Structure formats: C-alpha cells, structure tokens
Amino acid sequence: FFAKADAKQLHDALKLVCGYLRPGDDQCVNIGIRSDSISLSTKSELGHSQTSIQATDTKPCPESGFNYIPQYLMDYLARAVGPVSLSIDGQGLLLMEANQNKYVVTPRTAVKIRTTEKKKIKNAA
C-alpha cells in the first residue's frame, strides 16, 4: 500500500485528530490509504475524530486501515518538509520517506476505549 502527501498537511491533520485524546486515553491513530487520500481517525471515551488529506500515487489499503502510536508519527513529520511517501506492508509496517530520510513505525493493536466507572456512594445511616 502506498501514498504520497505533503508532510506539513499530514502533520497538521494528525495533530487535529489527536487533539481530542486525553493523557489517560489509549494513544492510537488509525491510518488508511484511500483512492485519492489518506484518512486519519482516533477514538476515545469522548468520541470519534477523523479527517483526511489529499494524496497522490495511491495504492489503497484495506478499509480497516492500520493503527499506530501517534507520537511516533508526529516526531518524524515535525521535521519533514515537502512531500512524504508512506509505504505500508501487508502486516502494517509503515515506512515514511521524506528529505532523503527514512522512518519505520510498527503497527499496534486497535484502540481500547477507556470507560470511567462512576463510584456509588453508600448512604451513611
């Protein structure tokens, strides 16, 4: 699976969808390569956030996409300038290339949404 996009646009989109994740949430972003775009989405107890950016030279991946730790992606994209290529193998291993630099990110399991249980207060009699 493959796509090319602008590194700054991808970084900004990643920051946007991850903006709703709180420190206690499972830090996970789902990336999917579509016919002409790259889709990004996150899920948490607060809800679901998603966006997409234009991409070229795409070879789409399965509809389910692949999951990654967002901070690893942001660390690389913060320093990248211009076009970045994303190559994903069948197991989800992601290779990002920009500015003659390469960065590999391993996939992770799907997000586990944390639910907060309200404590019951016992009445003192």
Where are these regions (language model features)?
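DNA polymerase processivity clamps
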Residues: 1-125
